[in-house]
């Protein structure tokens, strides 16, 4: 948000102009593309680790100043965590048949729709933590992959949806998505066999099964010519990306190419991940940091109280936020399933979890009151923008050790 950029630039200017200085150093970082793919923040991880090593820095706190929304004029909101985001991508492979004989094949759309109906808004894929609940999952895309019309059933179909999470791990979410998807296919296949029986059709098509993207890759790796295929596939993905193809489309295309290379004609569904991935993060759950989030909450509440304001602490910012890339709640190995399941080459979408773990800086969102965010009438409260928030940030810089030191 432009207000956040201007507000923090003003704080930087005022702090830098004071020759006496405060108790901590201030690094201003301006990055673009938040709420889409966070290219700026992901790209800045290398800079942050380089500066850390060059100047022996200890990052103690990161502050984003995105506006908050509230119906209470005397209330300020502090977010001490941010929701995580996964984007599962589902590619279904059917068995071709003529449209006039649908029970001699399996329509990939039938498989995809069965899974989509099962997963959409499923409560098992929401999450709860610290009294807050993440939104239910919702599909963004669902369609066949035919390039033109013909009279055959659909061989490939694909879709993707968003899963917003708080404490559940990517592995837990992937496992539950896998289980629910297989349940959906089992239910579909029972109905399908019953229809075949009614039509006097033989049961010659195998029961559809769900596999993970990682399993698909492992099966393909065992085949002759895989390395050459993989190199060509990655090059095509890079070229398509430069030509404007979305990450989600790249992931779908990559899975379809792997299925074609595998050559298994049985019906199946592949589940992987498409970018972007945002780890969930809450300052209460961070290890290996020198910062006490409770001290900040207390300090900010006391500051606001002297000005006649109340403080509302929200454990998670429920919109996508760059603070996801400031620290990890768990060890890097806990997130490996994401990297293994991303159906896009690292040259196209890079996420360096090791660097996030290296900077490991607690992050909060502390910004001005705003209204109609992301709309034409978007605006922020002038007093917050010019006085309340910047004045507190400056006080924090000058008295950080006195107020928030954990030693």
Regions found by a protein language model. Name each.
Residues 1-81:
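Acidic/histidine-rich catalytic neighborhood of metal-dependent amide-processing enzymes
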Residues 1-6, 103-109, 383-387:
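Short, conserved micro-motifs enriched in small and acidic residues
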Residues 53-253:
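Midchain, well-structured core segments that form catalytic/ion-binding scaffolds
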Residues 35-39, 69-72, 98-99, 167-170, ...:
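Flexible loop/turn segments at secondary-structure boundaries
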Residues 197-407:
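An extended, acidic, His-containing surface patch that forms the Zn2+-binding/catalytic region
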């Amino acid at each position: 948000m432009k207000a956040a950029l201007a507000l923090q630039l003003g704080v930087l200017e005022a702090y830098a102009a004071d020759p006496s200085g405060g108790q901590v150093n201030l690094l201003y970082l301006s990055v673009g593309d938040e709420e889409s793919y966070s290219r700026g923040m992901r790209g800045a991880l290398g800079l942050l680790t380089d500066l850390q090593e060059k100047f022996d820095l200890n990052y103690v706190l990161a502050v984003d100043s995105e506006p908050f929304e509230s119906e209470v004029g005397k209330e300020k909101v502090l977010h001490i965590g941010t929701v995580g985001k996964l984007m599962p991508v589902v590619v279904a492979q059917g068995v071709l048949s003529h449209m006039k004989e649908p029970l001699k094949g399996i329509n990939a759309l039938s498989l995809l729709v069965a899974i989509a109906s099962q997963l959409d808004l499923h409560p098992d894929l929401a999450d709860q933590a610290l009294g807050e609940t993440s939104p239910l999952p919702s599909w963004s895309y669902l369609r066949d992959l035919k390039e033109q019309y013909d009279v055959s059933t659909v061989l490939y179909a694909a879709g993707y949806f968003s899963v917003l999470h708080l404490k559940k791990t990517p592995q837990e979410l992937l496992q539950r998505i896998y289980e629910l998807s297989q349940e959906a296919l089992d239910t579909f296949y029972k109905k399908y066999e019953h229809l075949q029986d009614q039509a006097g059709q033989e049961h010659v098509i195998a029961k559809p099964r769900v596999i993970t993207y990682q399993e698909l890759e492992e099966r393909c790796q065992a085949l002759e010519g895989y390395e050459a295929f993989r190199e060509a596939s990655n090059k095509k993905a890079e070229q398509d990306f430069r030509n404007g193809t979305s990450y989600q489309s790249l992931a779908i295309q990559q899975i379809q190419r792997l299925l074609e290379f595998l050559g298994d004609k049985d019906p199946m569904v592949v589940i992987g991940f498409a970018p972007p991935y945002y780890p969930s993060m809450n300052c209460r759950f961070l290890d290996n940091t020198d910062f006490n989030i409770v001290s900040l909450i207390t300090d900010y509440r006391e500051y606001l109280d002297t000005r006649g304001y109340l403080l509302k602490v929200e454990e998670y910012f429920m919109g996508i936020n760059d603070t996801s890339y400031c620290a990890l709640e768990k060890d890097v190995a806990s997130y490996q399933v994401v990297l293994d399941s991303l159906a896009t080459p690292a040259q196209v979408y890079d996420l360096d979890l090791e660097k996030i773990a290296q900077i490991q800086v607690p992050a909060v969102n502390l910004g001005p009151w705003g209204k109609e965010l992301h709309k034409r009438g978007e605006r922020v409260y002038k007093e917050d923008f010019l006085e309340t928030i910047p004045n507190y940030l400056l006080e924090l810089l000058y008295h950080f050790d006195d107020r928030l030191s954990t030693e």
